[in-house]
């Protein structure tokens, strides 16, 4: 949507304030960075909450569109000898990347808090890919509406996390409802060094 706005701004350059254009451009660059961090080695989205393939354009198509609009958006590559920890406190997610591995973890509160209809009981879940192969993934979602399968996909057992006493970490019910929500306290993210 923001790329489309930039396209429109180019069509009406004298009508859009320069600061609005610049802010939109800066936001697009940040969004591509976030997309890279939250994606696996296969260049596709991770399956947290109601994520699924085939809903949004493929990453390569978005990069191509951005390039046509004048952005220098390339596939980001993690250096071969690096271990990079991305602690995205605003969203609650954490990504740990090397050149061949990507671990993405959900340390986020259930949200958005005002309307969490697309949330799953996936607190503390993670996904892991090695190269372009996904090793551990959450279920994501394959359908909407009210059904047993929808509830199963939103439940804790459909995610790579701990389920205690067959209970969901958050109370998900109906197709898009959440009652009591998991709360992650004392969130601490960092590298551990060996002695």
Region annotations inferred by a language model:
Residues 50-52, 142-195:
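CBM-like, beta-strand-rich accessory domains located in the C-terminal region of large
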Residues 3-137, 182, 191-193:
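Carbohydrate-active enzyme catalytic cores, enriched for enzymes
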């Amino acid at each position: 949507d923001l790329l489309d706005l930039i396209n429109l701004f180019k069509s009406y350059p004298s009508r859009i304030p320069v600061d609005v254009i610049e802010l939109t451009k800066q936001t697009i660059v940040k969004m591509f960075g976030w997309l890279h961090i939250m994606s696996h080695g296969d260049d596709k989205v991770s399956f947290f909450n109601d994520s699924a393939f085939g809903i949004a354009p493929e990453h390569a198509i978005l990069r191509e569109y951005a390039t046509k609009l004048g952005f220098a958006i390339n596939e980001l590559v993690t250096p071969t000898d690096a271990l990079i920890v991305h602690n995205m406190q605003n969203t609650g997610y954490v990504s740990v990347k090397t050149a061949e591995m990507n671990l993405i973890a959900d340390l986020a509160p259930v949200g958005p808090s005002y309307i969490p209809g697309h949330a799953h009981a996936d607190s503390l879940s993670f996904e892991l890919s090695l190269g372009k192969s996904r090793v551990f993934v959450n279920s994501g979602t394959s359908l909407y509406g009210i059904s047993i399968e929808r509830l199963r996909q939103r439940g804790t057992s459909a995610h790579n996390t701990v389920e205690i006493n067959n209970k969901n970490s958050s109370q998900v019910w109906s197709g898009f409802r959440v009652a009591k929500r998991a709360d992650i306290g004392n969130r601490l993210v960092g590298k551990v060094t060996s002695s």
